[in-house]
A protein has these predicted regions:
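Short amphipathic alpha-helices and their capping/turn segments at secondary-structure boundaries
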Residues: 19-32, 62-70, 156-169, 201-209
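Catalytic domains of carbohydrate-active enzymes, especially glycoside hydrolases
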Residues: 1-11, 71-72
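Vicinal oxygen chelate
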Residues: 16, 43, 81, 184-188
Length: 211
């Protein structure tokens, strides 16, 4: 009973350092507890159209990934931060930008995972996110699905059957209630697995069969 991995938020790691904490000491505490940093939650705006903003975001992502590496982690979430209100973002351009992010990660040893964000107007659907990963043409490309976000974005869970095991490194398991409806549900309405109506067991069995 229990868990073996954690997924800290980069902003919490930053706050820990600002408060005088040492990443070396934190890594030891994590490892002494028998835990592994499986991934981390970052918000670098790698996908945006503005060249200067995107260049700054890649440097931001580099710093974030270096922190993850120093904690013993090998992955970081790469959501469409900065483009959540943009409806017309070119997915081919997004794929090129994801490739640039992957190149940064490959130099550090941390893999950024293209993340589905159901509430966003960009990469809200599983198919869009998979498209960006495939068209990046990078061997480390992968996606980070989430049961709640797949539902919120309007994709069907059967789409996961098209993905092989290596395409998914981590999988977010968030359940959701029957009310409010999908169109108005928000992140704040998420519930623990088993407390909602999501087909959690069915989805996980299908994912496990792909491993």
């Amino acid at each position: 009973v229990g868990y073996t991995g954690i997924e800290p938020w980069i902003r919490e790691i930053d706050q820990y350092e600002r408060d005088g904490g040492s990443l070396k000491d934190l890594r030891k505490r994590i490892e002494d507890a028998g835990l592994q940093v499986e991934s981390a939650i970052g918000f670098a705006q790698w996908i945006v159209d503005d060249d200067k903003q995107r260049a700054d975001a890649l440097e931001h992502a580099r710093r974030d990934m270096d922190k993850v590496r120093r904690l013993g982690g090998k992955r970081i979430a790469a959501p469409p931060a900065g483009a959540t209100r943009q409806e017309n973002l070119d997915l081919f351009a997004a794929a090129d930008r994801y490739r640039a992010l992957l190149e940064v990660g490959s130099r550090i040893g941390v893999t950024p995972q293209a993340e589905v964000w159901g509430f966003s107007k960009t990469l809200s659907r599983l198919g869009e996110t998979v498209f960006v990963a495939i068209e990046s043409g990078h061997p480390d490309a992968c996606v980070l699905p989430d049961i709640y976000h797949i539902y919120k974005g309007g994709s069907d869970f059967t789409g996961l059957d098209l993905l092989s095991g290596p395409a998914i490194h981590c999988f977010h398991v968030n359940d959701y209630p029957a009310k409010p409806p999908r169109t108005t549900i928000t992140d704040a309405d998420r519930v623990y697995p088993g407390d909602g109506i999501a087909p959690v067991a069915r989805v996980l069995k299908r994912i496990a069969a792909k491993r």
